[in-house]
Amino acid sequence: MVPAEYNSHHIIMKEYLIFLAQSHPAFRKAELESLADLHNIKADFSNHNEEHPFMIVQLENDEEAYQLIDRAILSKSIYELWGHGNTMEELHTDVKKKVDQLKERYIDSSFKFENLTFQGGKKSREQQVAIFDQFRYLEFTGKIKLKNPDQVYTILEQYSLGANLQPLDTPDHIWFGRQVNISARSRGAVEKYDIKKRPYFGTTSFDAELSLFTCNMGQVKKSDLIYDPFVGTGSFLVTAAEFGGITIGSDIDFLTLKGKGPKRRLKSNFDYYKKPLQFTDVLCMDFTNNAFRSNLKFGSILCDPPYGVREGVKVCGSNDPRKEGREKVVIDGQLAFLRRDYIPPKKAYSLDLLLDDLLHFASERLDVGSRLCFWMPVANDEDIPTMIPQHEDFELIYELVQDFHKWSRRLLVYLKRGDDYKGITLTSEDREGVNNFRDRYFHKFSKLSMADKKNSNSSSGSV
């Protein structure tokens, strides 16, 4: 373990303890890395363990610790670490080694103590006070304030569960630290953006927790223009506004954008959260044939492309070749597609082609260093590495898996690189795997879907 403080290039690093959430543990490290990169914080998270709720990191100062956790969704809080041990005796021994240099700045500050446990159940007030009294040797002279104190000192305990799934009598490990900051999660962000609390939501609305997490992975920043090309009911845009993003979206489905009345539409969600100025607009538009000016750039692109399960994958056009080339039809002296009552035809499209279009679009619309984040569904028995779309202008920096037994969805995070970077391009024609997720889904992920059986039968009948 790295010492509590060490001199590296004349910078003294300090130990901090992060209390992690137990939701989506496989995603926690990626979020912390993205937030550290967003704030230009150099930190090593290699000792992260998905099975443990605590992690020690080395940071320069409290400001870095505060920024790292402030908008985190999969972390709870961060503490300047004053000591730790397997028992209370070991903890106090460790704290006493460092206390003189650590407490000097806070000796006169108002304060309170708190006790947090992982899997340990809730202690009675008497039990907590007995633990707090053991730290009398700190000899703080400031006032005790239970509400809004200057400093909060926390004893954190990790317990294991016994055979009856009840916590054991003694903790496995104990930490003591000074609270630096609590996260957006601990301040209630996930509950605040709960889908059912919004005026307008639908069957395709994205989970609040993962929407907020996706915004962090996309490094949404204040005043950045954030775009969702499959906006639906606006889950990503609403949560992007929480982090200061200026939002714009589009969708090919006019009825979704129209909503269910003047008080139950996408804009109503921004009014509900008192962020109307961060909502630019939503456009009824096929993004593969978009109306944006050629030099318009976005800070991030975040989306959940239609899988074809609840909503089919469609773009403007016609599957009937007889109807192609009829764009110049004139009605009453006016081009048909310019009339207010014109409804553009739509045709079915494949998810693979849609993702190719998305990467190409993002390559033209994102500046170097910006991120494209989208969720891609796959059947778990597919050869997944061969199905991931690639573009020469992007580096795939994260592939995060949320498993649903027979299928999974993956958050793919791409970083736009500069001219000196030359990645590979894998379009739907180049990729070996075919993402026929919709067909597999409706046939309950059987080994041979109807389309596969049809191809198999036609092959066996040939000579």
Please annotate each region the language model reported.
Residues 22-26, 85-92, 120-129:
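Generic detection of long, well-ordered alpha-helical segments
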Residues 34, 93, 97, 130-137, ...:
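Charged/polar, solvent-exposed surface patches and flexible loops
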Residues 50-105:
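Conserved AdoMet
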